[in-house]
C-alpha cells in the first residue's frame, strides 16, 4: 500500500466531515426534541384532528431531522474522500473535534441551551490537548517511532 502523506485537501475534507456531522447532531437533537414535545398532537392527527396547525408546527422539526440526515450523508462522503488522502492516524483523531463542536453548540445555541460545566469544559480541553499531541507538527514529515 502506498504511503499516504499529509494533504491539505485531505485535511479540508476531514474537517468538512467533522463540521457536517456536528451540524447533523445539533439539527437532529433539536428536531427530535421538538417532535417529542408535539407527540400528543401527532397522536391527535391520527385521530382526525386539525391537520393544518399540526403540519405547520411539525414542519420545522421534521425538516431539521431531514437536514441532519442529509448532513450525515454529506459527512460520510467527505470522510471517505478524506480517508483516501490521509493516514488513519491523522484522520481519525480529527473526528474528536466533533465532540468539541457539538458540546459548544449545545451550550451556546439558544434553542438547545444545555448547561456549561467545568467538568465538561475540562474534557473539551483534554480533547484539544490530545489533538496537539497526536497530530504531526508542520516540520514533522514522518513518525520515526
UniProtKB/Swiss-Prot annotation:
Topology feature Cytoplasmic, residues: 1-3, 83-89, 136-145
Periplasmic side: 25-61, 111-114
UniProt xrefs under InterPro entries: Flippase_ArnF, Small_drug/metabolite_transptr
Entry keyword set: Cell inner membrane, Cell membrane, Lipid A biosynthesis, Lipid biosynthesis, Lipid metabolism, Lipopolysaccharide biosynthesis, Membrane, Transmembrane, Transmembrane helix, Transport
UniProt superkingdom: Bacteria
Pathway field: Bacterial outer membrane biogenesis; lipopolysaccharide biosynthesis
SUPFAM superfamilies: Multidrug resistance efflux transporter EmrE (SSF103481)
Membrane-spanning parts: 4-24, 62-82, 90-110, 115-135
Signal peptide residue numbers: none
GO molecular function terms listed in the Swiss-Prot or TrEMBL record: carbohydrate derivative transmembrane transporter activity
Gene Ontology CC: one annotated term: plasma membrane
GO terms, biological process: lipid A biosynthetic process; lipopolysaccharide biosynthetic process
Recorded family membership: Belongs to the ArnF family.
Subunit structure: Heterodimer of ArnE and ArnF.
Protein name as catalogued: Probable 4-amino-4-deoxy-L-arabinose-phosphoundecaprenol flippase subunit ArnF
Gene name per UniProt: arnF
Amino acid at each position: 500500500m502506498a504511503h499516504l502523506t499529509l494533504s491539505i485537501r485531505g485535511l479540508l475534507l476531514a474537517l468538512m466531515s467533522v463540521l457536517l456531522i456536528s451540524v447533523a447532531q445539533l439539527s437532529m437533537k433539536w428536531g427530535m426534541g421538538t417532535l417529542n414535545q408535539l407527540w400528543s398532537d401527532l397522536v391527535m392527527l391520527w385521530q382526525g384532528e386539525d391537520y393544518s396547525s399540526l403540519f405547520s408546527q411539525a414542519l420545522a422539526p421534521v425538516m431539521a431531522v431531514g437536514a441532519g440526515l442529509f448532513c450525515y450523508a454529506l459527512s460520510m462522503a467527505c470522510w471517505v474522500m478524506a480517508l483516501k488522502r490521509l493516514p488513519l492516524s491523522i484522520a481519525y483523531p480529527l473526528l474528536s473535534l466533533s465532540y468539541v463542536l457539538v458540546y459548544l453548540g449545545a451550550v451556546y445555541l439558544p434553542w438547545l441551551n444545555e448547561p456549561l460545566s467545568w467538568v465538561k469544559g475540562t474534557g473539551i480541553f483534554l480533547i484539544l490537548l490530545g489533538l496537539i499531541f497526536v497530530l504531526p507538527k508542520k516540520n514533522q514529515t514522518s513518525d520515526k517511532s
